[in-house]
């Protein structure tokens, strides 16, 4: 699918299967989400540009690669997106963090915005927007709309699961934003949940209903 990368690493798929099980506990779900987010982050950042820097090792001077220019912003779509942040920040602790408050109205399935906080220089950084689920796509579309209003243009979207309907809507709204996901599931049900899915990621992560 154009503009969509499915990260099918065996460890990603193994951990995702355990997360899907309905009997997986809240604590295990949260731990697995942190672990899998590190693996996903590795893939979504694999083409970052490097520059050479002269350094001193204990033995000699050498030229060694280092990330070039201003670095990353991880933009979490609240609240479930926060479950992906910890593992990603373990990998890139210098990344800035943005929080975007968007929730889905369960009656209309439309996004409701309530919070936005991002670094002032988002136009100069690579923004990786994270949310475990790309269902209808409405929340992620709204979040990226807000980032673009602030000048962001180098954006990627990372999720755990995606529905074909959500991908179609997302790509129509933001064809310039590549999508990275661990799985493209079958479809959305009448309530807008991804099927077979794993349920509500936020509820399973925080033990709420």
UniProtKB/Swiss-Prot annotation:
One GO-annotated biological process of the protein: uracil salvage
Activity: how regulated: Allosterically activated by GTP.
Record's catalysed reaction(s): UMP + diphosphate = 5-phospho-alpha-D-ribose 1-diphosphate + uracil
Enzyme class: transferase
Keywords in alphabetical order: Allosteric enzyme, Glycosyltransferase, GTP-binding, Magnesium, Nucleotide-binding, Transferase
InterPro entries referenced in this protein's UniProt entry, alphabetically: PRibTrfase_dom (IPR000836), PRTase-like (IPR029057), Upp_B (IPR034332), UPRTase/APRTase (IPR050054), Ura_phspho_trans (IPR005765)
Binding site for uracil: 194, 199-201
Pathway involvement of the protein, from the record: Pyrimidine metabolism; UMP biosynthesis via salvage pathway; UMP from uracil: step 1/1
EC number of this enzyme: 2.4.2.9
Cofactor: record remark: Binds 1 Mg(2+) ion per subunit. The magnesium is bound as Mg-PRPP.
Ligand binding (5-phospho-alpha-D-ribose 1-diphosphate): 79, 104, 131-139, 200
Cofactor field: Mg(2+)
Family: Belongs to the UPRTase family.
Job of this protein: Catalyzes the conversion of uracil and 5-phospho-alpha-D-ribose 1-diphosphate (PRPP) to UMP and diphosphate.
Name of the protein described by the UniProt record: Uracil phosphoribosyltransferase
Organism, scientific name: Rhizobium leguminosarum bv. trifolii (strain WSM2304)
Lineage: Bacteria, Pseudomonadati, Pseudomonadota, Alphaproteobacteria, Hyphomicrobiales
Gene encoding the protein: upp
């Amino acid at each position: 699918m154009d503009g969509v990368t499915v990260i099918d690493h065996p460890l990603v798929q193994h951990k995702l299967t355990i997360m899907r099980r309905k009997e997986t506990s809240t604590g295990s779900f949260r731990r697995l989400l942190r672990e899998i987010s590190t693996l996903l982050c590795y893939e979504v950042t694999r083409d970052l540009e490097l520059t050479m820097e002269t350094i001193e090792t204990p033995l000699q001077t050498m030229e060694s690669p280092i990330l070039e220019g201003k670095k990353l912003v991880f933009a979490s779509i609240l609240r479930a997106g926060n479950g992906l942040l910890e593992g990603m920040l373990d990998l890139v602790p210098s990344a800035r963090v943005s929080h975007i408050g968007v929730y889905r109205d369960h009656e209309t399935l439309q996004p409701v915005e309530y919070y936005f906080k991002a670094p002032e220089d988002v136009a100069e950084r690579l923004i990786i927007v994270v949310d475990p689920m790309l269902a209808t796509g409405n929340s992620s579309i709204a979040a990226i709309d807000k980032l673009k209003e602030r000048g962001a243009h180098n954006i990627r979207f990372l999720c755990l699961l995606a529905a074909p309907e959500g991908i179609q809507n997302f790509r129509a709204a933001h064809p310039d934003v590549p999508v990275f996901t661990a799985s493209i599931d079958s479809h959305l049900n009448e309530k807008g949940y991804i099927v077979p899915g794993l349920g509500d990621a936020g509820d399973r992560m925080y033990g709420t209903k």
